[in-house]
Regions:
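Phosphate/NTP-binding elements of NTP-utilizing enzymes
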Residues: 1-136
Length: 136
């Protein structure tokens, strides 16, 4: 019998890994700063992070291996935009009924930054905005 965290219990799905990368480049634009309105072009480290996060699947049911993630990087590296984009991907592309995504922050002002980024990305993309209802 293999342990629950044994690699025998998981597989890497190239299609799922590619799907998340394609979503970023084809469906999202930056919401703030000098890149506002421009396509979300991922940096190499972001591509690696997202492929690892979304590509690994459970052998027993095909669901993602990782349900939570913590990313620690320095200031002004695009954490907020990346978190907002990941939340939008989970909401729109994982085919989970009544999907929920949570953004955890030290205070409401900090949490609002991520919410507002996701809101702007949604409003900038016709396909996302027609599938969404934003209440705030």
């Amino acid at each position: 019998m293999t342990s629950p965290d044994s690699l025998a219990n998981y597989y890497f799905d190239e299609n799922e890994a590619d799907k998340v990368i394609d979503f970023f480049s084809e469906c999202l634009t930056h919401s703030t700063g000098q890149w506002r309105g421009k396509p979300f072009e991922l940096l190499e480290w972001q591509i690696k992070y997202l492929r690892e996060l979304f590509g690994w699947r459970r052998s027993d049911n095909g669901k993602r291996r990782y349900r939570q993630s913590a990313l620690f990087i320095s200031r002004k590296q695009g954490k907020t935009e990346l978190a907002a984009a990941i939340a939008l991907y989970c909401l729109h592309c994982e085919n989970e009924p009544a999907a929920q995504c949570f953004n955890v922050a030290a205070d409401t002002d900090q949490a609002a930054l991520c919410f507002n980024a996701a809101k702007a990305m949604t409003e900038n993309e016709i396909e996302l905005s027609t599938r969404s209802e934003i209440y705030k």
